[in-house]
């Protein structure tokens, strides 16, 4: 369990600062299996989780959704047979905030507990 996975999101405003390059470098080391993607100039965190079947992938999607609702911070989720792609970024600031790294770490913790993962 990481420090990030024990943290909670803070309310984010449209004028909240994006993570700096140094913060990005420090935070990504705490979630090494996540990739930083640049989509139309917007940095995002992304990871693909593998499962044995669609039912397990869907259950994980539901668990991530429940976590997102509890924290008030929501990812893009793509659920397919045997896999779920999770993408975190902060829509209000069109980039990465510390909240995204917290949620990525907490998503990893959910995955560790997912039953019958491939």
Curated annotation (Swiss-Prot):
Gene Ontology biological process terms from the UniProt entry: tetrahydrobiopterin biosynthetic process
Keyword entries, A-Z: Lyase
Catalytic activity: (4aS,6R)-4a-hydroxy-L-erythro-5,6,7,8-tetrahydrobiopterin = (6R)-L-erythro-6,7-dihydrobiopterin + H2O
Listed InterPro entries: PCD_sf (IPR036428), Pterin-4-alpha-carb_dehyd (IPR050376), Pterin_deHydtase (IPR001533)
Top class in the EC scheme: lyase
Enzyme Commission identifier(s): 4.2.1.96
Gene Ontology MF term list: 4-alpha-hydroxytetrahydrobiopterin dehydratase activity
UniProt keyword Lyase, yes or no: yes
Source superkingdom: Bacteria
Family named by the database record: Belongs to the pterin-4-alpha-carbinolamine dehydratase family.
Protein name: Putative pterin-4-alpha-carbinolamine dehydratase
Lineage: Bacteria, Pseudomonadati, Pseudomonadota, Gammaproteobacteria, Pseudomonadales
